C-alpha cells in the first residue's frame, strides 16, 4: 500500500490573521498543512492566501466554469462566488445545474448561488422562470450557497410578496443574500439592508460606499470588463478593512486571460495600502462571509495558497488548492475536456423586409448611449427616411437597433440609437442582458439581416457583418459560452473586436455597450424584444412622437 507523500515548501509566509510575515517551511499532507516551521531567514519568494472573486458571472467570460477555472488559477485565484444569473435566464434551473456539473470535481472553490431575478423583468421574454417556490427548493441544496444579487430593489422596498418569499427562503436556509442597489441612500438603503441583504457590488461613489459600510453592509470593489470602480472606492480598504471585498462581476475573455483579482491586489499595494488589509479583501473576507472552507496557511488548514516572486510584481509562481499544484508557473496542470452542449434557441432566420420601419411621425425617440456606460438618455430627433421608411443615418450617428426573441419566432423590436459612432456594417449577438435575446446594430438592413441570421444559424454567438463578409465567434453553450479553452476563446474574441474596430466606431467596446442596451432595470431608454421601454416610468413608449 502506497503511503501519501509529504510535500515541503519554503517561503516568506504572509499570515493575514495575525498580521505578520516570516520565513517558513510548510509541510503538506493529504491536502492539508501539517507543520508550519519558522526558518528565521528570508526565503525569497512569498506564500500568500489564494484570491477569491467575491462576485462574478462566469458566463460573461464566454467560457464554461471549467475553462474559467483554468484561467483564474494562473492569476492566483482559488475561488469565485458565482451567480449563474445569465444562463438561468436562458435555461432556468437546468442552466444552474449545468454550471454545477461542469465545475464538479475540479479543485477550485466555485461557490454558486441561486439567481434571484429570473426573469429580470416581465417586460421582456426570457427562456425560463425561477419563482419563489423553486428558489426555496434550490436554497436547500448544499451545493448552492447564497441568494444572488437582488436587483429588484423596488420589490424589496415595497415588500412584494414574491420577492420577500425568496429573501425569507434564504434566511431560513441560513444563507447570505447579495444586493444590487447602486444609488441607494438614506431610509431606502436602511430598509433594503434591514430586509436581510448584506452585500453590494454596484457601488460607484465613495460616499455611497461609506454610508453602506456604516450601516453594516459589505461593499465589493469591482474592477471588471464592464464596470471599473476601484479608483473611486479604494479608500474604503483603509477605512473599513473588515467589510471590503474584491470582485470582477463581468470578466470578458481577453480581460481574464491577462488578469483577475491579482490586478486589484497589485493596484492596492502600489498605492501603499496595508498588505494585510488588501489580502483580507482579496481572500479572507469573502471566505468568511460566504463560509468558503479555504485555508489561510495555518496548521490543519486546507492547503490553499499561492507562491509569488515578491510583493511588488506579484508574479504567480504556483497556485495550490487542497494540496494540489493547479498552476506551476507556466501552465495549468488541470485537464480540460470539451463540455457537453446545452442550449435554448428556437427562432428562425429573419427575412429582410422584417427589418423595415415605416415612418409614422416626423420625430422619433432615440436611445443615447456612452461607451462602457449602462445608463442611457432619451432624446428626440427628426426622422431620416427613404421612400417612407426610416433608415440609419451615419451623418448624425443614429443607427438602427434590433432585438429579436431567440426563444420563439416573433417579429423584431426596432429602435434607433445614438452614440456608437458606427460608420460601416453591423453587429449581432446573443449576449443581451438579462434575457439574452438577439441584439443587433447596423448601418444597412442587409448587413443587419446577415449578422442576425449567422447568429441564429450558429444558435448563439457574436457576428460582425461588413458588405458580404461575416465573422463569427460561436457561443454554442446556451448562446453565452464557447466550448473552447479561455485562451482560444480570447483569441477569437480579440479577432471579433478587431473586426468591430474596422466598422469605425470610436468606442472601446461597442460589443459590451450593445449587450446592455436591452437591460431594462437600468435607466433611461432601453429596448425590449416587446418594444421601446422607459426604465424611469417602467412603461413601454412609442418610437414616433
UniProtKB/Swiss-Prot annotation:
Keywords: Hydrolase, Manganese. SUPFAM superfamilies: Metallo-dependent hydrolases. It catalyses: adenine + H2O + H(+) = hypoxanthine + NH4(+). Belongs to the metallo-dependent hydrolases superfamily. Adenine deaminase family. Its cofactor is Mn(2+). It comes from Parabacteroides distasonis (strain ATCC 8503 / DSM 20701 / CIP 104284 / JCM 5825 / NCTC 11152). HAMAP family: Adenine_deamin. This is Adenine deaminase. GO terms for molecular function: adenine deaminase activity. Its EC number is 3.5.4.2. The keyword Hydrolase applies. Pfam families: Adenine_deam_C, Amidohydro_1. GO terms for biological process: adenine catabolic process.
